[in-house]
Regions:
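General structural signal for secondary-structure boundaries
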Residues: 21-24, 77, 205-206, 238-243
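An amphipathic, hydrophobic-aromatic interaction surface with interspersed Lys/Arg
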Residues: 1-62, 66, 70, 130-225
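Extended, charge-biased low-complexity segments
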Residues: 57-86, 94
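Long amphipathic alpha-helical segments with strong coiled-coil/leucine-zipper propensity
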Residues: 80-166
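Short N-terminal micro-motifs specific to bacterial/archaeal maturation
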Residues: 122-125, 192, 200, 234
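Long, intrinsically disordered, low-complexity Ser/Thr/Pro-rich regulatory/activation regions
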Residues: 229-251
Length: 251
């Protein structure tokens, strides 16, 4: 499903806390630090369980705790995460690991504890999961379901091992196949004749790229089937599906 706001580059409201802006192609391709933030902002509880499955730890951190751990332990990570929030929110934040809270709208240098902590806009453990899903949405990814609470640790570890096996199989299949890299996708869009060129394609939202490719493929399949019918193909075997439909939708 294509989100029209993200397609046109408009932000999504995250409750009454902040707006989350869809990054552009330039944002993603020209900023290695943001790639790190993307992984950190989107990591799921299941992925953390998979990472810690063979480690003897008393408790596996939540995605929010994992973010704070990275910020607290590494100054470079702290700078990168602040940069990532600025790019997504278009406003500064202050991260306070000791209080387990992210204050929106003020940088560390600007924050006045006497004035800005009365009714602050914050991201914390209570709303971080929902914030992550908004981030996933502006990046063109699918939101995830909340993790199962109070699940038996043995069941969690068993599920983690199954996912590890599935990833290994997927990697083997990927090596045999020929995946299309992002550069090839944006080059293909520049050849569609819709006004996008290497000079301006960096201005569209990052999430648009697979959507434009998908719509183009649907249109191409429809055109091929129509031409085949005009050339005398068997109508029972060639049944054009109209291309203006939601991506992956069967009609």
């Amino acid at each position: 499903m294509i989100n029209e706001k993200i397609f046109l580059g408009f932000p999504l409201d995250f409750k009454d806390v902040c707006k989350v802006y869809p990054p552009t192609v330039n944002d993603m391709c020209g900023d290695e630090e943001f790639e790190y933030c993307q992984t950190l902002f989107m990591i799921t509880q299941e992925e953390l369980e998979d990472a810690y499955v063979n480690e003897n730890v008393p408790a596996i951190p939540t995605p929010f705790q994992y973010l704070l751990m990275n910020v607290h332990q590494d100054d470079v990570a702290r700078v990168n995460v602040l940069h990532g929030f600025q790019k997504l929110l278009h406003e500064p934040v202050t991260i306070v690991p000791e209080l387990e809270v992210i204050i929106i709208g003020k940088s560390e240098e600007e924050l006045d504890p006497d004035k800005d902590l009365e009714n602050p806009r914050v991201i914390d453990a209570n709303n971080y999961f929902d914030f992550q899903n908004v981030v996933r949405t502006v990046l063109g990814a699918q939101p995830v379901e909340p993790p199962v609470e109070d699940e038996d640790p043995r069941i969690r570890r068993y599920k983690a091992k199954i996912r590890a096996s599935e990833r290994m199989i997927a990697r083997k299949k990927q090596k045999k196949g020929s995946g299309t890299n992002f550069g090839t996708l944006i080059a293909a869009i520049c050849c569609m004749g819709i006004g996008l060129t290497p000079l301006n394609i960096g201005e569209i939202s990052y999430a648009c790229v697979p959507w434009l490719i998908g719509m183009s493929q649907q249109k191409e399949e429809y055109d091929i089937d129509i031409r085949a019918l005009l050339a005398g193909a068997d109508k029972k075997k060639v049944k054009p599906k109209y291309w203006i439909k939601d991506l992956n939708e069967e009609i």
